[in-house]
Curated annotation (Swiss-Prot):
This is Netrin-1. Keywords: Apoptosis, Cytoplasm, Disulfide bond, Glycoprotein, Laminin EGF-like domain, Repeat, Secreted, Signal. A motif (Cell attachment site) lies at residues 530-532. Disulfide bonds join 119-152, 285-294, 287-304, 306-315, 318-338, 341-350, 343-368, 371-380, 383-401, 404-416, 406-423, 425-434, 437-451, 472-544. The gene is NTN1.
């Protein structure tokens, strides 16, 4: 009965392999006109769902590396059969050079025909401690369901199955078979499997009987008896346990009748060898639920045909720009597809941030990198400094952000309101870009205060508010007519400045004029600077028109350094020279300034 079941399994696996080999090839062109098959990775509504590659015999047609094969040189071997209690031997020649008498490793993974068995065979009597190994490379990671071997010889007394997850660099045990588990593999016999050790190999004496002498089967199920097998989707331990890139079978001890040391021991020893008609590794290409098939890439390597925005040989990572949530294996309940970062079409790269993902309630963790089109932010969702949103365009538009264009002098900074585009204006400046003076202000030459208040002229001049003393003629001599500026006058004074009278206020015995110093042609120890300052003149000097000053006018002021009443500003008196400004004087005063520097 077991033999019949095995034959059915082998035939099914062979047919599956043949179908898989021709899938997608020219042989299907005759069906091109038929309706397209439903997408296994999406449901009827187009939503992602788990998909897995077909179950196959991953060993079919693949090369197997063996440590021993008979026939080099040609050698005799004898097949033992039993008739009642009588033991018969039929001897033959194994010759690797003769295809009809050869038993190469290719027979392990060819199409298994029960009516025409082909068997790989080892050299005779390679007994413990000498091993015979079969090593099969699957070409990529597979999730292995079973490993089976059908024998042409008696089954081994002891053998082990190993797996590699790193293409043969390291090996871990998968299963041990022996009648002497402790002696051969230092393992307990049929140790119980619990959740704590379900990822470990066990040793059993099942399938180790010598009989049948031919046609015996050893089949190892990777999940049989493992406690978490019923919840495989949620068991990373078992998912790792069934994963393999390579399978190795190590035959450790031959079964014998105990006659190998008798008189005709040579004949007996020629009867003991390992011979296998079929090696199968049943499983699926490992794609973590994100692919329905495996294909050959440009390098002829077997890789998953990844879906759900995943990438990698096993669809084990998210493809670029799909990092809004962490990669996860698909399950029967959730496809766990990778999600694109939300960058509003302004970025081509992003990264995943676990902290942000947790803060969002495990919904979004993508952070956009190198936002373009003058955008900024985690999602490129606002305009960078110096730009504001054009509400007439969607945020995904290439020109969703407009330049603020804040005036370099009138604005207090380059950043404008993200919604209105209003720049931060300095005092007295207005306009969206701060490009003009507000009402009641006039432009100045100061980059610090480009707009100043327009002073309200008093009903009378400063001089008319003070009664002129009777002795003005003896006190000072008011200037009359036009005055000339020469180098002598320039040199006699401590400072020479161009001023603009803004307003005048009475302060006890003084008049305080708010002036804007437009240009400085000479300065003393007080280090006069351009901009708004106070000009102090005694009331008696103003009353005698020494000097004569009117608000809102521009003057050339040459005077001597004196202490002002409030220790700020400059002082003018009857000896100061105050002349209404002429633009032609600027060049002459610069010459005076240069000549004075040369003479120093």
């Amino acid at each position: 009965m077991m033999r019949a079941m095995w034959e059915a399994l082998a035939a099914l696996a062979a047919v599956s392999c043949l179908v898989g080999a021709v899938r997608g090839g020219p042989g299907l062109s005759m069906f091109a006109g038929q309706a397209a098959q439903p997408d296994p990775c999406s449901d009827e509504n187009g939503h992602p769902r788990r998909c897995i590659p077909d179950f196959v015999n991953a060993a079919f047609g693949k090369d197997v590396r063996v440590s021993s094969t008979c026939g080099r040189p040609p050698a005799r071997y004898c097949v033992v059969s039993e008739r009642g209690e009588e033991r018969l031997r039929s001897c033959h020649l194994c010759n690797a050079s003769d295809p009809k008498k050869a038993h190469p490793p290719a027979f392990l993974t060819d199409l298994n025909n029960p009516h025409n068995l082909t068997c790989w065979q080892s050299e005779n009597y390679l007994q413990f401690p000498h091993n015979v190994t079969l090593t099969l490379s699957l070409g990529k990671k597979f999730e292995v369901t079973y490993v089976s071997l059908q024998f042409c010889s008696p089954r081994p007394e002891s053998m082990a199955i190993y797996k590699s997850m790193d293409y043969g660099r390291t090996w871990v045990p998968f299963q041990f078979y022996s009648t002497q588990c402790r002696k051969m593999y230092n393992r307990p016999h049929r140790a119980p499997i619990t959740k704590q050790n379900e990822q470990e190999a066990v040793c059993t004496d099942s399938h180790t009987d010598m009989r049948p002498l031919s046609g015996g089967l050893i089949a190892f199920s990777t999940l049989d008896g493992r406690p978490s097998a019923h919840d495989f989707d949620n068991s990373p331990v078992l998912q790792d346990w069934v994963t393999a890139t390579d399978i190795r079978v190590a035959f450790s001890r031959l079964h014998t009748f105990g006659d190998e040391n008798e008189d005709d021991s040579e004949l007996a020893r020629d009867s003991y060898f390992y011979a296998v008609s079929d090696l199968q590794v049943g499983g699926r290409c490992k794609c973590n639920g994100h692919a329905a098939r495996c294909v050959r890439d440009r390098d002829d390597s077997l890789v998953c045909d990844c879906r759900h925005n995943t990438a990698g040989p096993e669809c084990d990572r998210c493809k670029p720009f799909h990092y809004d949530r962490p990669w996860q294996r698909a399950t029967a309940r959730e496809a766990n597809e990778c999600v694109a970062c939300n960058c509003n079409l302004h970025a081509r790269r992003c990264r995943f941030n676990m902290e942000l993902y947790k803060l969002s309630g495990r919904k979004s963790g993508g952070v956009c990198l190198n936002c373009r089109h003058n955008t900024a932010g985690r999602h490129c969702h606002y305009c960078k400094e110096g730009y504001f949103r054009d509400l007439g365009k969607p945020i995904t538009h290439r020109k969703a952000c407009k330049a603020c264009d804040c005036h370099p002098v009138g604005a207090a900074g380059k950043t404008c309101n993200q919604t209105t585009g209003q720049c931060p204006c300095k005092d007295g400046v207005t306009g969206v870009t701060c490009n003009r003076c507000a009402k009641g202000y006039q432009q100045s030459r100061s980059p610090i205060a480009p707009c100043i208040k327009i002073p309200v002229a008093p009903p009378t001049t400063a001089a008319s508010s003070v009664e002129e003393p009777e002795d003005c003629d003896s006190y000072c001599k008011a200037s009359k007519g036009k005055l000339k500026i020469n180098m002598k006058k320039y040199c006699k004074k401590d400072y020479a400045v161009q001023i603009h009278i803004l307003k005048a206020d009475k302060a006890g015995d003084w008049w305080k004029f708010t002036v804007n110093i437009i240009s400085v042609y000479k300065q003393g120890a007080s280090r006069i600077r351009r901009g708004d300052q106070n000009l102090w003149i005694r009331s008696r000097d103003i009353a005698c028109k020494c000097p004569k000053i009117k608000p809102l006018k521009k003057y050339l002021l040459l005077g001597n350094a004196e202490d002002s009443p409030d220790q700020s500003g400059i002082v003018a008196d009857k000896s100061s020279l105050v002349i209404q400004w002429r633009d032609t004087w600027a060049r002459r005063l610069r010459k005076f300034q240069q000549r004075e520097k040369k003479e120093l």
